[in-house]
Swiss-Prot record:
Pfam families: DNA_pol3_beta, DNA_pol3_beta_2, DNA_pol3_beta_3. Confers DNA tethering and processivity to DNA polymerases and other proteins. Acts as a clamp, forming a ring around DNA (a reaction catalyzed by the clamp-loading complex) which diffuses in an ATP-independent manner freely and bidirectionally along dsDNA. Initially characterized for its ability to contact the catalytic subunit of DNA polymerase III (Pol III), a complex, multichain enzyme responsible for most of the replicative synthesis in bacteria; Pol III exhibits 3'-5' exonuclease proofreading activity. GO terms for biological process: DNA strand elongation involved in DNA replication. It is found in: Cytoplasm. GO terms for cellular component: cytoplasm; DNA polymerase III complex. This is Beta sliding clamp.
Length: 374
């Protein structure tokens, strides 16, 4: 093959592909990027056994079609050092030659036929995403998922598809908290009325880098494939049964408080400078924040005024993990939030008020959280 390509287009695509390379074993075909020139397009692939990405860029000129491979890390290292002008890529015998002006680099290739095939699936479920609400849900739920969880089912995000009602539930948990949302009015095509899959967190994070809107999602139960005009991404799914999260959601709450999000974030941040756990006290006209630290004598306290006042007869105390509480608040797209509680020792819920409008492009996330024992 022999082509000329834009330096910027090539470099941007190579950066996307880095996450899919085996950088520990340079002798592995998985350390290489597969190149294929067809007419005026250069297709680039990187893959290991669990995850992969195929992208393309347009060539500036194509003198000869063909295939080749090149060490992905070294390829990016070279391209990123070159000037912002076109680059010539040419295969010669068992090497790939990179040229720009008076600079030339020659790197060995592997047998392109040994590169793993990009999977083609017969989907059991598929949907077209024309707005960023799914990516928004992934972004907001990602912090809740532990990638190294000893329970492999919890090392990913649960996606529950319901074809009858055209809804998609997205759920993540680390056993200390659980975040979930239900996306509605989406176009789901499925071979079954109810079907679910568990997407690994690693895959979720790569999807956030590559896709925003106008893409498709397909799954056959073992693999998931996500595609748009320039990228095709695949991942193995986590094989296992996700816990029935509906069973742990309280049926009702004895108390419900509507509170200012930014004021609470400020109070929690101030107290969390000394401790990761905080005692929250709600009174009729005030919210009090106090750091909890049993090992040292250090303390931090602050309070915020509740303008509208709470319908509360006596003070309500709650122990919270500062980091978890802040992440739950950051997932909300409203200026206020609702805190729903039962006993101080029972799980509590953080969600958006039903009567406050937010962008229809945002996912409405609810987070159930275990309290800290006071």
């Amino acid at each position: 093959m022999k082509i000329s390509v834009s330096k910027n287009d090539l470099e941007n695509t190579l950066r996307y592909l880095q996450a899919f390379l085996d950088k520990k074993d340079a002798s592995s075909i998985a350390s290489h990027i597969h190149l294929e020139v067809i007419k005026e397009k250069l297709f680039l692939k990187a893959s290991d056994s669990d995850i992969g990405l195929k992208s393309y860029i347009s060539t500036q000129s194509t003198d000869k079609e063909g295939v080749g491979t090149i060490n992905g890390k070294k390829f990016l290292d070279i391209i990123s050092c070159l000037k912002d002008s076109n680059i010539v890529l040419e295969t010669k015998d068992d090497s790939l030659v990179i040229k720009q002006n008076k600079s030339s680099f020659k790197l060995p290739m592997f047998d392109a036929d040994e590169f793993p095939e990009f999977p083609v699936i017969d989907p059991k479920v598929s949907l077209e995403i024309n707005a960023p609400f799914l990516v928004d849900a992934f972004k907001k739920i990602a912090p809740v998922i532990e990638q190294t969880s000893h329970k492999r089912e919890l090392a990913g995000v649960l996606m529950q598809f319901n074809q009858k009602h055209q809804t998609l539930s997205v759920v993540g948990t680390d056993t200390k908290r659980l975040s979930y949302t239900q996306l509605e009015k989406i176009s789901i095509h499925s071979t079954e009325e109810d079907i679910s899959c568990i997407l690994p967190k690693r895959a979720l994070l790569e999807i956030l880098k590559l896709f925003y809107e106008n893409f498709s999602f397909k799954s056959d139960g073992m693999l998931a494939v996500v595609e748009n005009e320039t990228h095709a991404f695949f991942t193995k799914l986590i094989d296992g049964n996700y816990p029935d999260y509906q069973k742990i959601l309280p049926k009702e709450y004895t108390s419900s408080f509507t509170l200012g999000k930014e004021e609470f974030k400020e109070g929690i941040k101030l107290c969390s400078s000394l401790s990761s756990t905080i005692k929250l006290t709600l009174e009729k006209n005030n919210a009090l924040f106090e750091s909890l630290d049993s090992e040292h004598s250090e303390t931090a306290k602050t309070s915020v005024e509740i303008e509208k006042g709470l319908d509360i007869e006596k003070a309500f105390h709650l122990g919270v993990n500062a980091k978890f509480f802040l992440e739950a608040l950051n997932a909300l797209g409203t200026t206020q939030f609702v805190l729903k509680c039962n006993e101080p020792s029972s799980p509590f819920l953080i969600q958006e008020p039903l009567d406050e409008k937010q962008s229809h492009l945002n996912a409405k996330i609810s987070t159930l959280m275990m309290p800290i024992t006071l």
